[in-house]
Amino acid sequence: MGSDDTGGLFKWTIDALFNRDTSPSTMYDKQLQQDSFDEEIYSRPRASSFSDPDIYSKYELLRDEDEPDLLRPVSMNGLPYEKQDTNTFHARRARERRVQETPNIRRAPNPNDPIISKLFQVDEDDSQLNTNEMRSQREKFNTGRLPGKFPSPTKQYNARISNRDAFTGAERKAASTAPAIPPVAPSVQNLDYTPEYVKLMDKLSLNNKELRDLKVDVRERQKHGMEKETELKKKYLQIRQELIQELKQSKMIYDNYCKLYYKYKGVKRSIQLPTQTLASNSSMLDKIASLEKQIVDLSIEKDRLKKKSEERILSVELQKKELENKFEVERMIYERRIKDLEEKLYVHEHPIRPATDTSPVSSSSFMPHTQETSDSTASPYKEYNNTIDTQFLRNLVK
């Protein structure tokens, strides 16, 4: 009915609806038969299995890359390649590991699950039922307490037969001829699971909020990391450019040093030292003596010229001072002469009138002050003679 790719989905649905002994989740339960001497399962390999390695080795075929055997992790039990567990339902058991890692595959509800126990109020005593008899009894009479479990119309729930071998042939015949008792379905409890669902939704909301906060935090950290990486990259490029400039400058300095060194060696080779001593070379000594004499004469001449120039400078400065004094005296004489002429002009333009008895104030009071002092007090520069000062300065210079 159902293929191996879907895991027998139709068969699982039929088993769940009609309350068969086989549960859809039994293939995921790790219930392996154990021997007394070893926990390994040694099964006979099937000759008709297409995954038999003998077929590939016989016909020199390449294995399919999508084959589950290739994608399966490496076995750590140390068995050789020939002894593989390849019984009929080995593929289903091996697919258990892959199914557990796949969250999209839906499983039948398990009463041992703590969430199922909390939602549907499964007793702790019921969760500890591990024997086959108690498990089958729980599946028969408590199927209405889990979603997906419905009462089967073909089974009688009131007739519980524990041992079929205890009936005799007559009893079986009487039971077969008796009228059939209609099956009575167990009463289904109407429980309100709203608070549990609300709590679960609240937890999911909190988890979603924490996931969003975590996502925002991760984005901020990623953004900060990218900014820091950009800044470090910028600094790295800057330091790299500085290093390149320093290397170029160091190379230039080294090249210049090499040039100077080779130039120094060339100059050193070009200079030929004299083979004779200076004491034995009279011409060189005479030349040195003449040069020293010339140096002395030039130094004496230099001192004489320096002294002469200083005397010349002093005489020029004295002449300059003499001329400045002369110009100052002449300026004062000219200023006094101009002032006298201005006074005479004023007297000529304003003659003095005789005083009368009627006039209360004399007209002489309106004359300027210069007129009063011109006749009464003689100016010291009026009869000035610059010959005396000139002669005095000349004697001072000498």
Curated annotation (Swiss-Prot):
Positions with biased composition (Polar residues): 356-382
Signal peptide extent: none
Recorded superkingdom: Eukaryota
One Gene Ontology cellular component: spindle pole body
Location (main, coarse): cytoplasm
Keyword annotations from UniProtKB, A to Z: Coiled coil, Cytoplasm, Cytoskeleton
Coiled coil: 201-350
InterPro entries referenced in this protein's UniProt entry, alphabetically: Bbp1_C, Bbp1_N
Keyword Coiled coil listed: yes
Entry keyword annotation includes Transcription: no
UniProt subcellular location: Cytoplasm, Cytoskeleton, Microtubule organizing center, Spindle pole body
Region Disordered, residue ranges: 93-115, 351-382
Chain's role: Component of the spindle pole body (SPB) required for insertion of the nascent SPB into the nuclear envelope and for the proper execution of spindle pole body (SPB) duplication. Connects the central plaque of the SPB with the half-bridge. Required for proper localization of CDC5 at the SPB and for proper M-phase progression.
Quaternary data: Homodimer.
Family, similarity comment: Belongs to the BBP1 family.
Protein name from the UniProt record: Spindle pole component BBP1
Naturally occurring in which organism (per UniProt): Kluyveromyces lactis (strain ATCC 8585 / CBS 2359 / DSM 70799 / NBRC 1267 / NRRL Y-1140 / WM37) (Yeast)
Source organism phylogeny: Eukaryota, Fungi, Dikarya, Ascomycota, Saccharomycotina
